[in-house]
């Protein structure tokens, strides 16, 4: 409750973390959510901002029947991600909450998570996050390109 003060849906600070792409014209295609952890100032964010961001998007998309049926694919562009960025989000409590929300609390069909331009220092963070996922979702996490 304390973490979600000022949860305005159009809070620009939150939208610097994630971007929801428009619906595809192809019926049955998943929605795409892009995250760019290296594109923000790490001094402005708390670890709970990631959880807040994801929850706001899921709350908004709950009104879209196509989203619930077709699911979503998350795309992560990790370019320019530094150790300072990772320290903002490398909080096991927030990672666990985020994983549980995505796979258990919302009727969201996670189609995949594709990460590219991932620095090697981010591998341990990704492995920590995967610990909280069920086997089906773990198998859908793909690293496209390491930097």
Where are these regions (language model features)?
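SEC14/CRAL-TRIO lipid-binding/transfer domains and related phosphoinositide-recognition modules
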Residues: 1-108, 121-147
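Residues embedded in well-ordered beta-strands within globular domains across many folds
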Residues: 114-117, 142
């Amino acid at each position: 409750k304390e973490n979600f003060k000022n949860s305005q849906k159009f809070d620009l600070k939150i939208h610097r973390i994630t971007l929801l792409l428009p619906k595809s014209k192809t019926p049955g295609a998943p929605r795409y959510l892009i995250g760019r952890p290296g594109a923000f100032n790490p001094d402005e964010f708390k670890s709970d901002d990631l959880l807040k961001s994801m929850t706001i998007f899921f709350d908004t998309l709950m009104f879209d029947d196509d989203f619930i049926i077709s699911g979503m694919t998350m795309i992560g562009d990790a370019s320019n991600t530094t150790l300072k960025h990772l320290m903002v989000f490398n909080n096991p409590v927030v990672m666990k909450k985020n994983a549980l929300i995505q796979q258990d609390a919302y009727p969201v069909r996670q189609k995949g998570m594709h990460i590219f331009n991932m620095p090697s220092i981010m591998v341990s963070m990704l492995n920590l996050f995967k610990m909280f996922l069920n086997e089906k979702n773990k198998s859908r996490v793909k690293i496209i390109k390491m930097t």
